[in-house]
Regions:
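Conserved ankyrin/ankyrin-like repeat signature
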Residues: 44, 76-77, 109-110, 143-144, ...
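Bacterial N-terminal signal peptides
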Residues: 12-23
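N-terminal segments that cap or nucleate solenoid repeat domains
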Residues: 27-68, 77
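Ankyrin repeat A-helix N-terminal signature
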Residues: 35-39, 68-74, 101-107, 135-141, ...
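Bacterial N-terminal signal peptides that target proteins for export
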Residues: 2-14
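Ankyrin repeat domain, specifically the short helix-to-loop turn at the C-terminus of the second helix
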Residues: 49-54, 79-87, 112-120, 146-154, ...
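Terminal, low-structured helical/coil segments at or just beyond the last alpha-helical repeat
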Residues: 490-566
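Ankyrin-repeat boundary/"N-cap" motif
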Residues: 29-35, 58-64, 91-97, 124-131, ...
C-alpha cells in the first residue's frame, strides 16, 4: 500500500472510530456538548453553551463537539462552537483534528473558518504526518486546496510512511484539476516516494519503506520510489500525465523495480496513457528488474490469465499499442529469460519465457505471433531451459482453467507457422521434453496428428526427474503418450488430467509403427505398485490407462525416488 493509498485507510479508520463512538450507550462525564453535537442538535448545544458547559470536553475517544460539527460540515454549529472557545487543533486519540476532517470532506468554507480561528495548515494529522493538503488533494476539491495553499500549506511536505506528497495523492486518485493547482503552487514534479526493498513487502511481508536517497538504485523485486508521473501512469490518468510532463516530469525516471512510467502504465492495463508516453519519448526498451520490457508486458496483457489473486482483467486490446511500440523501435528479441513473478506466487510451473514472441506463442495468438515475426522476431531463440517456440506454441506447461489461450484451431496455426519456419519438431529442452509431449499434455489430437505427420518421435523419452519431482513429475524417463495419460503433468497439486482420445490416437500409431510403451507400471500408477494388475510390458497404453484410473482415480502423487514395481 503506498502513502496515497494509506489515505483511504485513514479515512475508513477515522469514520469507523466516530461511528463506533456514536453507538456507545454512555459518554464520558462532562461531554454533554460533544454528545449533542454528534446528533446535530444545535438547540441543545446553544443551551449548554449558555450554561457555560465545556465546549472542549471530549467523548471517550477524544472526539470533541467541533470534530462532530466539522465531520457533518455544519458551518453554523462550527461558528457557534468556535465563538464559544472551541479548540480548533484538538485531536482525538487517533490524532484526528477538525482540520483533517474538513480537508477530508473537501469543504472550503469549513477550512476557512478553522484556519481563521488559528488552525495550522501544515499540522500533521496522524502519526505518519499526513497533512490537510494531502487529504484535500485526494478528494480533488480544488477550492479546498486553494484555501489551504493561500493559508500557507506547503505542497512538498512528504508523509513519513511512504514518503508521498500531495501531488502524488492527487495523481493517484486521477484528479487532473488538483494536479494543476499543485503544479501552479510549486509542487515538485519529480519528487520520489520511499523505496521498498521487497515487492509487496509492505502489504504482505510487513516491511517498511526505506528512507529515500539521492543515490538509491533499484533492487530486485523492489517497489516504491515512484514519481507523480508514475502514479498518474499507474492509474491511467492521461490528462495529469500531460500536465506533469509539460511541467518537467522526467518521462524515463525509473521506479524501484526499474520500470519507467510506460512500463507501469502497460503493466496496469492503461494503454491510452502508455500511447501518450511513447509520443513523449518514453524508452520502449526499458527492462525492469525481472528483465521484462514494456513490449513484453503488452504482449502478456493481451492474453492475461485470470486467477483469484489478479485484482483486474484488462478488457481493452493492446494490439494497437504493440504495433506503435514496434514502430517506435521496441526490440521483439529482447531476452527476458524469466517467469512473471505473479505466476510464481500463483504456484504455476510456467516455462521460462525467452522473448515476447514465446509469450505470444504460448497463448496460441496467431495475429500477434505474425506481427512480431514481421518486425524481426526470431522464431529460433530458445529459453535458458532450452524450451523452443514450438514447445511454447504446443502448450508446454499450459494449465486449463488457469492460463488463458486462444481456440485450438488458432493454436494449431501457430504450431504450423513455427514448423514452416524451420523449428525442429524433435528438439528437446533441458528436461528432454519435446513439442509432442507438450501437445500430448494438452490432449489436442489434431495437433498431435500434425506433429506426428511432420516427424515427431513417439518413441522419444524425456530425461526423467524433471522439475525435481514437482508437479507429478516422474523419476523415470517418460514417453510422449505418458503426457496424454497424465503422468507428465504440469498441474499444481499433481492433479491428473487424462486425455483418452489423445491416448487412443497415440497408442494406435505406436502399434502401427511397432513402438513399445516401456514406462513401468509403478510410474504409471503412482505408489500403487503393490496392487498391480496390469503387465506394462504387454498391455496397451489404453489398458494401462483404464487400470490406472481404477487404481488412483484422477489424482497422482509425485514419485520421489527409485521405486520399482513389485
Amino acid at each position: 500500500m503506498n502513502g496515497a493509498g494509506r489515505g483511504s485507510l485513514w479515512r475508513v479508520l477515522l469514520c469507523g472510530a466516530l461511528v463506533a463512538v456514536a453507538a456507545l450507550p454512555a459518554y464520558a462525564a462532562g461531554s454533554e456538548v460533544a454528545d449533542a453535537a454528534s446528533k446535530g442538535d444545535r438547540t441543545s448545544v446553544r443551551s449548554l453553551i449558555q450554561r457555560k458547559a465545556d465546549v472542549n470536553a471530549p467523548q471517550v475517544d477524544g472526539t470533541t463537539a467541533l470534530h462532530w460539527a466539522t465531520r457533518a460540515d455544519d458551518l453554523d454549529l462550527a461558528d457557534m462552537l468556535i465563538a464559544a472557545g472551541a479548540n480548533v487543533s484538538a485531536a482525538n486519540r487517533e490524532g484526528v483534528t477538525p482540520l483533517g476532517l474538513a480537508a477530508m470532506n473537501g469543504s472550503a468554507p469549513m477550512l476557512q473558518k478553522l484556519l481563521k480561528a488559528g488552525a495550522d495548515p501544515n499540522a500533521p494529522l496522524d502519526q505518519f504526518k499526513d497533512t490537510a493538503l494531502m487529504m484535500a488533494s485526494r478528494t480533488g476539491k480544488t477550492d479546498a486546496m486553494r484555501v489551504l495553499l493561500e493559508a500557507g500549506a506547503q505542497p512538498n511536505i512528504a508523509e513519513t510512511w511512504g514518503g508521498t506528497t500531495a501531488l502524488m495523492w492527487a495523481a493517484s486518485e486521477r484528479h487532473p484539476e488538483a494536479v494543476k493547482v499543485l503544479i501552479d503552487a510549486g509542487a515538485e514534479v519529480n519528487a520520489r516516494s520511499k523505496f521498498v526493498a521487497a515487492a509487496n513487502g509492505r502489504g504482505f511481508e510487513g516491511r517498511s519503506p526505506k528512507a529515500d536517497a539521492s543515490d538509491q538504485k533499484p533492487e530486485d523485486f523492489a517497489s516504491g520510489w515512484l514519481t507523480p508521473l508514475m502514479f498518474a501512469a499507474r492509474e491511467g490518468d492521461v490528462e495529469s500525465a500531460r500536465m506533469l510532463v509539460a511541467a518537467g516530469a522526467e518521462v524515463n525516471a525509473l521506479a524501484g523495480d526499474a520500470k519507467n512510467a510506460l512500463g507501469l502504465a502497460i503493466f496496469n492495463g492503461n494503454y491510452e496513457v502508455a500511447s501518450y508516453l511513447i509520443d513523449a519519448k518514453a524508452n520502449v526498451n526499458q527492462a525492469d528488474t525481472q528483465r521484462f520490457t514494456p513490449l513484453y508486458w503488452a504482449v502478456d496483457r493481451r492474453n492475461m490469465e485470470t486467477a483469484p489473486n489478479f485484482p483486474w482483467v484488462v478488457t481493452a486490446d493492446p494490439l494497437p499499442l504493440i504495433k506503435k511500440m514496434l514502430d517506435a523501435g521496441a526490440d521483439p528479441n529482447a531476452l527476458v529469460q524469466n517467469t512473471p513473478r505473479a505466476r510464481m506466487r500463483e504456484g504455476s510451473p510456467r516455462i521460462v519465457f525467452a522473448t515476447p514472441l514465446m509469450r505470444a506463442a504460448f497463448a496460441g495468438d496467431i495475429e500477434l505471433t505474425k506481427l512480431l515475426l514481421s518486425h524481426g522476431a526470431d522464431p529460433k531463440i530458445i529459453s535458458n531451459d532450452g524450451e523452443t517456440m514450438l514447445e511454447a506454441a504446443c502448450g508446454l506447461a499450459f494449465i486449463q482453467g488457469y492460463h488463458r489461450g486462444r481456440p485450438a484451431a488458432e493454436r494449431l496455426e501457430v504450431v504450423k507457422l513455427f514448423v514452416e519456419l524451420g523449428v525442429d519438431v524433435n528438439q528437446a529442452d533441458d528436461y528432454g521434453i519435446t513439442a509432442l509431449m507438450a501437445a500430448a499434455n494438452m490432449g489436442d489430437t489434431k495437433m498431435i496428428q500434425y506433429l506426428v505427420d511432420k516427424g515427431a518421435n513417439l518413441a522419444a523419452y524425456d530425461l526423467g526427474k524433471k522439475n525435481d519431482g514437482a508437479f507429478g513429475a516422474s523419476v523415470e524417463p517418460l514417453m510422449p503418450v505418458d503426457y496424454a495419460i497424465g503422468v507428465g503433468t504440469f498441474v499444481p497439486n499433481n492433479a491428473v488430467i487424462i486425455h483418452e482420445d489423445a491416448v487412443a490416437l497415440m497408442a494406435r500409431v505406436m502399434k502401427e509403427r511397432g513402438i513399445t510403451h516401456t514406462t513401468s507400471e509403478c510410474t504409471l500408477r503412482g505408489f500403487t505398485c503393490a496392487q498391480a494388475r496390469v503387465d506394462p510390458k504387454v498391455a496397451s497404453p489404453a489398458e494401462i490407462l483404464r487400470a490406472r484410473k481404477l487404481a488412483i482415480g484422477h489424482q497422482i502423487e509425485g514419485v520421489t525416488g527409485g521405486l520399482e514395481a513389485k
